[in-house]
Amino acid sequence: MSAAPRDDRAAGPSGVLCPAEPWRLVGSLVVSFFRVPAGALPDAVGARIPAGARPVTVAGSTLVAAAFAHYAPGGVLQYDELLTAVPVRYGRRLAVTVPHIWVDSPQSRAGGRELWAIPKDLAVLTRSGRGAAVRAAAYADGAPIASLRAEVGARLPPGRWGAALTTLQRLGGQEVRARSRAAFRPHAARVSWSFAPSGPLGHLAGRRPWLSLALEDASVVFGTERTRRAVP
């Protein structure tokens, strides 16, 4: 597959070049969903949610997604990523806020922050595996953040799935709502996570996933539409 054409632009005060939106990315993801008591969510979650929005809770708990993504050649950028996301409600609408995210690409970091107010930080991410077995880990400043071991199982019917997603973010005096879409082949997965208890994802340490999936042959178009406003 040939790489998608790039439209580089300067992003942010660092002047790091990144593709203009929308970003077309291809690769695979391993994602798990955790039930977390609303009172156990760290302050960083609230700091990234725009005023007027709030996390979605059911029976006092919020569903937190944790994912490792591997974006491969064929998209506008190639990099690895660790993130968490929480569903939020604003008015009668639903969206997702990403409070924690790490990448190993300066271009991805710059673009995520400048274009969509996604608080990407740089980290060392490792990924290995053979066949259905996948291992991944993330480190920041030499300290572990999280790691996983996954066994990818059978493909789920009916084949290729599609999904639309809205992100709602607050960062650096900006609130940004962005729309994206994705297509992928979902697989069952057995995933074991390890989160550093004293790290930024310590609120997930010791918790078992409620559901885990492997998303193979994924195609993501991020930032198909965006609205932005300045906030105090």
Segments and roles (model prediction):
Residues 67-144:
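Aromatic- and glycine-enriched beta-alpha-beta binding-site module
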Residues 9, 113-232:
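Interaction-surface and assembly-scaffold signal
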Residues 1-81, 91-96, 108, 208-210, ...:
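N-terminal domain-onset segments
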